[in-house]
């Protein structure tokens, strides 16, 4: 059983590489544009493959249109990949938008903004302390 899992994982990895090449080099559909294949999850019986993809687009409507274009071309993409892989049965492809990359970038930007805001507040607070200390030093010197 463990051997079955490793075989499906190896097939998924090879399928991911082949899909990335096919989508980059062989697909001429302008609706799809630049697509990145993040992961491929193959069923145990190799009949289905979930292909997780991302795009540079953030607009949900455009992303949905691109996923629909990929789904419409799934049979053609499947035939191109089947010619490159030596499998008895080529899995049926299902394209799924993977928003984890976009969410990760959004979270990274939020963290960076909070850090820069915090540094600005600390600097401002430090400048205020310097001003109050220098005024205290001047008042002590007058006595």
From Swiss-Prot:
UniProt subcellular location: Cytoplasm
Compositionally skewed regions (Basic and acidic residues) per UniProt: 116-128
A biological-process GO annotation: maturation of SSU-rRNA
Record's keyword terms, sorted: Cytoplasm, Ribosome biogenesis
Transmembrane segments: none
Region of interest called Disordered, as start-end residue ranges on this chain: 116-143
Main localisation: cytoplasm
Family statement drawn from the similarity comment of this UniProt entry: Belongs to the RbfA family.
PANTHER family (UniProt xref): RIBOSOME-BINDING FACTOR A, CHLOROPLASTIC-RELATED (PTHR33515:SF1)
One GO cellular component term noted in the UniProt record for this chain: cytosol
Assembly information from the UniProt record: Monomer. Binds 30S ribosomal subunits, but not 50S ribosomal subunits or 70S ribosomes.
Gene: rbfA
InterPro entries on file: KH_dom-like_a/b, RbfA, RbfA_dom_sf, Ribosome-bd_factorA_CS
Function text: One of several proteins that assist in the late maturation steps of the functional core of the 30S ribosomal subunit. Associates with free 30S ribosomal subunits (but not with 30S subunits that are part of 70S ribosomes or polysomes). Required for efficient processing of 16S rRNA. May interact with the 5'-terminal helix region of 16S rRNA.
This protein's name: Ribosome-binding factor A
Molecular-function annotations in GO: ribosomal small subunit binding
Keyword Cytoplasm: yes
Species of the source: Shewanella sediminis (strain HAW-EB3)
């Amino acid at each position: 059983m463990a051997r079955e899992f490793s075989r499906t994982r190896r097939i998924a990895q090879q399928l991911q590489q082949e899909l990335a090449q096919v989508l980059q080099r062989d697909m001429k559909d302008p609706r799809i544009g630049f697509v990145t294949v993040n992961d491929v999850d193959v069923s145990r019986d190799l009949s289905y493959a979930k292909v997780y993809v991302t795009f540079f687009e953030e607009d949900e409507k455009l992303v949905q249109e691109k996923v629909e274009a990929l789904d419409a071309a799934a049979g053609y993409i499947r035939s191109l990949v089947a010619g490159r892989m030596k499998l008895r049965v080529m899995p049926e492809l299902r394209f799924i938008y993977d928003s984890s990359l976009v969410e990760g970038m959004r979270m990274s930007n939020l963290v960076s903004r909070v850090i820069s805001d915090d540094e600005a507040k600390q600097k401002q607070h430090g400048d205020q302390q310097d001003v109050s200390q220098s005024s205290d030093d001047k008042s002590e010197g007058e006595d």
